[in-house]
């Protein structure tokens, strides 16, 4: 029993405790519960075992903790010491509750390992509560300050002047140093436009390769990185080619360098003005080259350029209304040529001169051989026409452009090589953009395409749309079939449960909303899907009612003279319209007495799963049986007047030691009632009436200490509830279902509807103690509770407390002390 003055005091204020309490298997840590109790009593709980600790609450903990506690001289006590201090309200002698170390004499190899299966509380680490993180932040701050101090004026600075803007500030001396380093490392520097013009005159190979190599470097963000990357990628290859072949500068001007497949593009406005180069969307104002250099180049390559222009003019005259469109890769090249400005102008003129100087027959032969690879460009009204042809190269160079060829940007270009002109004209609008196509653009492009020329079978867009609609309908079919199948199975279970007498009825979630209040199916549902229903196998000759047993009385029937108390309760409830939740069938009561009650394992309203009549039914929501070790225990335990922290500890102990399941109220399977505070509750009275153990909280604590359930008798609350051991012994000695005899010799009682505790509970208590309950006040000699009707002299009107006190003391109390005022 709990001491009245010991609760809430700070009588352990001088105690500094370290708690280490584990389960006997070493998988559950109960330290937090006992630490909370110590804090409530005023003790200081330390998270670490240090020199300030005076008491160590130890149970099945680490051997290192035990050794350290003995070394420091702290007092090792068990969990019972904490409970005794709480009950006594004062500091109890520690020698009465010494801690036990079961692993002290065991070898190191056989010691149990502690592995807590409880989830830890997640605490977000911040510099304020984590020293390691704080040190890391301080070190980062010191490093940042050191780097700032080491910065000088020569280091480039990134300036974020406004959102989404970045200014790169680089002093001149840094650029000089960078150029010098690049020269020493023999790297190709990023040339200016004038340097690129000179380079194109000296080395025509470079000007021919620029266009093809711009493809792979277009995604680079800055022009500087683009120029340095492109020139470093092809400069060395051209130099090596010159050294290998040993060609002179004159030979290089007449022969095209075959180091890569070159895309030769000549842009012009139209046949009327073919001499001017097209520069769409200029982003920078390029430095225009001098007229002298242009005229000089024009004189040197005039004849060849004229022939080239005539040829291009012939192409444009052949298709005067069409705009020859660039693929995404070509538009990337053209856009970057505009950025580079005059360099590409000179490169184009120089390239025209180089190609023009080659023999005429060779060119014709080459064009005939590669006519299938020519990229025909398409119609557009927005930009002037231009022609692009693919010039062949050696296998080595083709291997070097392997990545570019298989890049996603060139996918449509490769597809366009295989498509005829009609299909390409329809696909042309999507090829202007350098970016990827959106879903909307892709769909529009597919709608515009004519696929009649592709493959052997001709299929129109309407047939394709029909195919798509068919596929969509085929995708929807399985879903509908699954729904139909589910509804068929549902109806099959319903009809087999209600219509066919040879099948076992199975109430439950399978019927859902399709069954009426009595379990019958709706007629329209059955008639609409009657053709889906097929008979089930596995018939039996017996049907079972899931609600009541064989011996349960029917409604409206008159009870026999020798009716059991359960039958009387049933009749009482039917006449009054209230459910007392007490009545059970005779068959179920006998099953509980013999030890195989289905009400615990399968619930009171479910049929026996081992019944052979249910073998033909499919139960999707019922899980397969597990082994007997994992089955739910048949004994239930009820807690009453128990604080929440104690409830948590009891739940953990029961889950560790096994053998019990929890129930919210005392029922026919309850064997133990744990009482937190010695207060008379309905669960305590129900436990007494059913012959249960009425135990204190210490029984669980000592069982936890020893690692198994111990004898209950020393912890039975027989002083507070004298009837508890008497009823328990009567239940133990009874060979059949236990039935109390306290009210067996009392006259019939009528429980008033306004009684407190509730009428149903009082009815159950009276019947469990052998009394008789009358459904009407005219048939009773005792009326329990406040009665508003006309009172008669022959009837005793007693308070509800008479029933409660009689059950608690296990004797019939005097009526005179419980008479209600007339």
UniProtKB/Swiss-Prot annotation:
Tissues of expression: High levels of expression are found in the developing forebrain and, in particular, in the walls of the lateral ventricles.
UniProt cross-references to CDD domains, sorted A to Z: BRCT_microcephalin_rpt1 (cd17716), BRCT_microcephalin_rpt2 (cd17736), BRCT_microcephalin_rpt3 (cd17751)
GO cellular component: centrosome; cytoplasm
The keyword Phosphoprotein is annotated on this UniProt entry: yes
Composition skew (Basic and acidic residues), residue ranges: 542-553, 625-634
Domain notes: BRCT domain 1 is required to prevent abnormal chromosome condensation. It binds directly to the SWI-SNF chromatin remodeling complex.
Protein's name in the database: Microcephalin
Lineage, highest ranks first: Eukaryota, Metazoa, Chordata, Craniata, Vertebrata
